[in-house]
């Protein structure tokens, strides 16, 4: 499909720079592609009223790390050069894949010093991607990164304001526990203890999977056709216990409600052709565009995404391209707040 089919104009004033407070007071656009009322404006705290007892919410429990590192390139016979690296996927106890800027100033064999944390450029790939081999390893490396790193705010926020101490709380879900993400699973940012309590009272199950969201989630689609786009890889895990529990939900007639596109991509990666979920522990590069047949997820809660992004393609596959174009036009016109710190939506899958 042509990538420009997924384009739309978004005014700057619709881009959220801070989250709603309280989190569950964010606006909530209900999208029913096959319903008599296609669009409905609500608030996130009303989520339980759109679900049924026996449904299951699936959350991504990854935890954002301060993966933005500022350093100096050291090369024999050359001047020290400032570089910025965003870690995006751990590949060994002492090794991370990262996106470096400016990438053209870095080559294999360079050493980068991040304020006392040293790394060797073990490999150099395309589009500024490098493999960093650190002098520290395991928990020692984790502590060192936490000490020198910064929260890697999305480019559309970082371009408008610097990171501050509030972001370390705001850009983290209340249930985050598995360290390794470069970006937050942002649909989950709307959940509060009060909303969890309301969901419990409504008989809605909660289950957790882990997908370590990488910096590739912010990469623009440069191809003109979706067939030519290469999707980034992210490491994910679905336990045998979670797969079994979700299969039981489906067997009882309950619905799988994915909190965020990261949970959805992982569940669809772990699903067999008949829709049964299997244990999963691997990297996924699943790229979902219109025409994809969803196997596991029935309902999707998700924020509002960038024009021509892989995530707007995903929601268009889930609820229909024309439905989502209408939903986004309504959201823009009525002042919904977009992107990571913005408002949310609840999409019911289009099956016709």
From Swiss-Prot:
Q: Where in the cell is it found?
A: Cytoplasm
**Leading EC class:** transferase
| Main localisation | cytoplasm
Per its UniProt record, what SUPFAM superfamilies does this chain match? QueA-like (SSF111337)
Q: Which Gene3D superfamilies match?
A: QueA-like
Q: Key word S-adenosyl-L-methionine present in the record?
A: yes
Record-listed E.C. numbers? 2.4.99.17
**One GO process term, biological-process aspect:** tRNA wobble guanine modification
Keyword Heme among UniProt keywords: no
Swiss-Prot/TrEMBL keywords: Cytoplasm, Queuosine biosynthesis, S-adenosyl-L-methionine, Transferase
Q: Please name the pathway.
A: tRNA modification; tRNA-queuosine biosynthesis
Q: Which InterPro entries does the record cross-reference, listed alphabetically?
A: QueA (IPR003699), QueA_dom1 (IPR042118), QueA_dom2 (IPR042119), QueA_sf (IPR036100)
Q: What's in the GO CC field?
A: cytoplasm
* Record GO terms (molecular function): S-adenosylmethionine:tRNA ribosyltransferase-isomerase activity
Question: Could you tell me what reaction this enzyme catalyses?
Answer: 7-aminomethyl-7-carbaguanosine(34) in tRNA + S-adenosyl-L-methionine = epoxyqueuosine(34) in tRNA + adenine + L-methionine + 2 H(+)
- HAMAP family per the UniProt record, alphabetical: QueA
Query: Subunit structure, per the record?
Result: Monomer.
Functional note:
Transfers and isomerizes the ribose moiety from AdoMet to the 7-aminomethyl group of 7-deazaguanine (preQ1-tRNA) to give epoxyqueuosine (oQ-tRNA).
What's this protein's family per the entry? Belongs to the QueA family.
Name listed for the protein in its UniProt record:
S-adenosylmethionine:tRNA ribosyltransferase-isomerase
| Organism per entry | Allorhizobium ampelinum (strain ATCC BAA-846 / DSM 112012 / S4)
């Amino acid at each position: 499909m042509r990538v420009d089919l997924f384009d739309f104009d978004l005014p700057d004033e619709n881009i959220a720079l801070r989250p709603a407070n309280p989190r569950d007071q964010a606006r909530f656009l209900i999208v029913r592609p096959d319903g008599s009322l296609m669009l409905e404006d609500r608030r996130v705290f009303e989520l339980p009223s759109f679900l049924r007892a026996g449904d299951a919410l699936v959350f991504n429990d990854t935890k954002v790390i301060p993966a933005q590192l500022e350093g100096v390139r050291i090369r024999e016979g050359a001047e020290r050069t400032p570089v910025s690296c965003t870690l995006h996927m751990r590949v060994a106890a002492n090794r991370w894949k990262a996106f470096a800027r400016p990438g053209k100033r870095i080559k294999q064999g360079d050493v980068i010093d991040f304020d006392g944390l040293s790394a060797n450029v073990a490999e150099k790939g395309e589009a500024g991607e490098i493999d960093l081999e650190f002098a520290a390893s395991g928990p020692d490396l984790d502590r060192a990164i936490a000490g020198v790193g910064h929260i890697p705010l999305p480019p559309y926020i970082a371009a408008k304001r610097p990171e501050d101490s509030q972001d370390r709380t705001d850009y983290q879900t209340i249930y985050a526990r598995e360290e390794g993400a470069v970006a937050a699973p942002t649909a989950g940012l709307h959940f509060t203890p009060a909303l969890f309590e309301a969901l419990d009272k409504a008989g809605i199950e909660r289950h957790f999977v882990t997908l370590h969201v990488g910096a590739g989630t912010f990469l623009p689609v440069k191809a003109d056709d979706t067939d030519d786009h290469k999707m980034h890889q992210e490491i994910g895990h679905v336990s045998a216990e979670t797969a079994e529990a979700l299969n039981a939900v489906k067997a009882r007639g309950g619905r799988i409600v994915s909190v965020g596109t990261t949970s959805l991509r992982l569940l669809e990666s772990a699903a067999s052709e008949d829709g049964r979920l299997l244990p999963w522990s691997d990297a996924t590069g699943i790229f979902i565009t219109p025409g994809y047949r969803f196997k596991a997820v029935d309902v999707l809660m998700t924020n509002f995404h960038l024009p021509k992004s892989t995530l707007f393609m995903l929601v268009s596959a889930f609820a229909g391209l024309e439905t989502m174009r209408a939903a986004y036009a309504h959201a823009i016109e009525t002042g919904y707040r977009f992107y990571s710190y913005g408002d949310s939506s609840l999409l019911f899958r289009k099956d016709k």
